[in-house]
């Protein structure tokens, strides 16, 4: 997806900056080498992932640099904030803004979008971003009153505009009701976000050596130590389970 975004931005900015043909060719080849069939499923030896981790990090850094150059070339000078949508269709998006003192964004129609600040940076929920395009917003740094669309009746019951969420005593999703489609998402008796661990003792090799009976011995991770709603704001609700 990063490479597709880079290619799109490079085409859009080609009237201002030259298309980075050599760089994109090198990046594609590096990425495709690391799509080898033993690497993708996690079945290569440990040393392979030490190498690919460094190579992916270097590629991501280069892609980010090229993308930033092209987005900057497409933006008009000014104090606004420009948001790009590289998807092939218009839509609503939750956009990360990083660390910022911006409290809200204002579009050209006068619609105000509140910004929520979290431990992982600021986020804003934007409506109808244009397909493969961008939109510039004015920024507001003064405090904005914005009610949250999320309601907690207690620590284990959350209401959102789209869902009813219920957690059990282990922190598992006991119920997820889809309000728009009027349906229960889980089958009766099933839970969401259940982590199940299986015993893995290879007989001969470190990889590709999975016992046919491995499913007969497993452990469910249900020893909940802490359940805390860390964030409830205009954009998101953040739940932390330990």
Pin down the residues of each PLM region.
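Basic, alpha-helical interaction scaffolds
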Residues: 1-18
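Catalytic and substrate-binding regions of extracellular carbohydrate-active enzymes
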Residues: 21-25, 33-242
């Amino acid at each position: 997806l990063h490479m597709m975004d880079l290619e799109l931005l490079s085409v859009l900015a080609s009237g201002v900056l030259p298309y980075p043909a050599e760089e994109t060719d090198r990046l594609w080849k590096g990425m495709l080498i690391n799509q080898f069939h033993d690497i993708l499923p996690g079945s290569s030896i440990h040393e392979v992932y030490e190498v690919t981790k460094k190579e992916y990090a270097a590629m991501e850094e280069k892609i980010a640099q090229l993308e930033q150059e092209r987005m900057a070339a497409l933006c008009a000078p000014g104090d606004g904030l420009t948001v790009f949508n590289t998807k092939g269709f218009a839509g609503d998006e939750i956009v990360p803004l990083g660390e910022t003192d911006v409290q809200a964004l204002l579009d050209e129609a006068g619609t105000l979008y509140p910004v929520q600040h979290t431990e992982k940076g600021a986020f804003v929920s934007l409506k109808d971003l244009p397909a493969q395009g961008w939109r510039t917003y004015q920024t507001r740094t003064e405090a904005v009153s914005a009610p949250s669309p999320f309601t907690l009746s207690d620590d284990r019951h959350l209401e959102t505009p789209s869902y009813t969420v219920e957690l059990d005593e282990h922190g598992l999703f006991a119920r997820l009701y889809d309000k728009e489609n009027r349906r229960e998402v889980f089958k009766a008796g099933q839970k969401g976000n259940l982590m199940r661990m299986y015993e893995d003792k290879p007989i001969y090799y470190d990889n590709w050596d999975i016992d046919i009976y491995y499913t007969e011995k497993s452990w469910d991770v249900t020893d909940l130590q802490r359940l805390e709603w860390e964030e409830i704001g205009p954009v998101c609700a953040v739940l932390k389970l330990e």
